[in-house]
Regions:
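Transmembrane helix-loop junctions and nearby membrane-interface residues
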Residues: 24-31, 57-58, 91-98, 155, ...
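Alpha-helical transmembrane segments and terminal signal-anchor/GPI-anchor hydrophobic tails
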Residues: 192-222
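Hydrophobic transmembrane alpha-helices of secondary-active transporters
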Residues: 47-59, 180-187
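Alpha-helical transmembrane segments
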Residues: 10-21, 81-88, 142-151, 199-204
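N-terminal signal-anchor module of multipass membrane proteins
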Residues: 2-36, 42-43
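Transmembrane alpha-helical segments and their boundary/interface "anchor" motifs
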Residues: 16, 40-48, 59-93, 98-115, ...
Length: 222
């Protein structure tokens, strides 16, 4: 029998999946409207997936090197091997354009389609023991600062300096997503800060919608 809490997280995963589908079926428009705002709201899909992953991984006992190694030996092949297998069709399709060596390197780095998420989650698997040991206040403060600085840096490089950074390079750095995974880990460890979390979540949601609106005034709709 599935526990009630498992149903809850299955529901959240379903919502996140719908958001991902909406993101990848969205067509950019040239003016601000309700569709653009909805598209911006859908951007919480990846953070939601990371928080859910952090919740369950954070419950695991990784206090010793033996337990940590056993966890990695079990978990890494479960996500990395399927990614490599599903990358094969992309390698065959793009063989003439990128060549076998560059194509294989891209595949190993999660560069086929949206597989960057697999590399990202592997990074968090490696960081989980450190996150578990750091106190709530320190982990939230440090992770929030790191994520903020990371986002500012990549926005500067991609939208101001106009560097063409591919998705598998601008999406995989853990520093861009760290705070979301940390929140999940701390929830998984039984720390309760739901009202503070919801207030922060809604603040940044409306801030992102405002950013989209003012950004679109200059004819640049995200």
């Amino acid at each position: 029998m599935i526990k009630e809490k498992d149903w809850y997280f299955d529901f959240l995963r379903g919502i996140a999946i719908v958001m991902v589908i909406a993101i990848h079926t969205y067509v950019a428009v040239d003016e601000i409207n309700g569709i653009v705002l909805i598209r911006q709201a859908m951007n919480c899909a990846v953070p939601l997936f990371l928080a859910i992953s952090g919740y369950f991984i954070g419950k695991k006992d990784l206090s010793s090197l033996e337990k940590y190694n056993a966890f990695l030996k079990k978990q890494l092949p479960r996500v990395y091997v399927p990614m490599l297998l599903w990358s094969i069709p992309f390698l065959l399709i793009n063989f003439r354009h990128s060549g076998i060596h560059l194509g294989m390197l891209t595949a190993f780095l999660g560069g086929c389609s949206v597989f960057y998420f697999i590399i990202l989650i592997i990074e968090f698997y490696l960081l989980t023991p450190i996150i578990q040991k750091v106190s709530l206040s320190k982990s939230l403060a440090v992770s929030s600062l790191i994520t903020l600085v990371g986002i500012i840096l990549f926005v500067y490089l991609m939208h101001i300096k106009c560097y063409n950074i591919p998705l598998y390079l601008n999406g995989t750095p853990f520093l861009l997503w760290l705070v979301f995974y940390v929140l999940g880990v701390k929830f998984g460890n039984g720390v309760s800060f739901i009202w503070w979390f919801l207030s922060l979540a809604f603040f940044f949601l409306f801030a992102s919608l405002g950013e989209t609106y003012f950004y679109s005034i200059n004819g640049k709709v995200a």
